[in-house]
Amino acid sequence: MTTKIFVNLAVKSLDKSIEFFKALGFAFNLQFTDETAACMVISDDGYAMLLTEAKFKEFTRKEIADATKTTEVLTCLAVDSKDEVNRIVDTALEAGATEARKPMDYGFMFGRSFNDLDGHIWEIIWMDPSHVQQ
């Protein structure tokens, strides 16, 4: 099955979140972006919908998790090199993110994690392609 994925995340300040993720190198699909939502392009088939809390509440009757106190999701992105892992996470930290945990290095896999401006955890990993079975 081929499908696209949209991860929906509630944010306190849409403008600050857009600025933060643009600093990391992400682009936004303006067709699905307005004053209540922003469609962040992760890949051809992967997107993060950054939604104001009011907009997010339109999709659920449940309370919105405070991501600074509880983890509702851990979003993991795989990149092409260890250098890219470090570039993204270092840029995130410079833009106001906080380190979620210490870096992990298993030789064939390297990763670092950060909490974004709203406390959502983003893990950026690299895996040695020769180690991954096809």
Briefly describe each language-model feature range.
Residues 1-18, 72-77, 128-134:
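N-terminal beta-strand motif that seeds the catalytic metal site of vicinal oxygen chelate
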Residues 60-65:
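Short beta-strand/turn micro-motifs at beta-sheet edges
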Residues 73-90, 96-97:
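Mid-chain, well-packed structural core segment of small domains
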Residues 8-56:
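Core segments of cupin and vicinal oxygen chelate
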Residues 89-134:
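Vicinal oxygen chelate
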Residues 24, 66-68, 124-125, 129:
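Membrane-topology and secretion signals of cell-surface/extracellular proteins
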Residues 1, 45, 117-118:
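Residue-level recognition of short loop/turn positions
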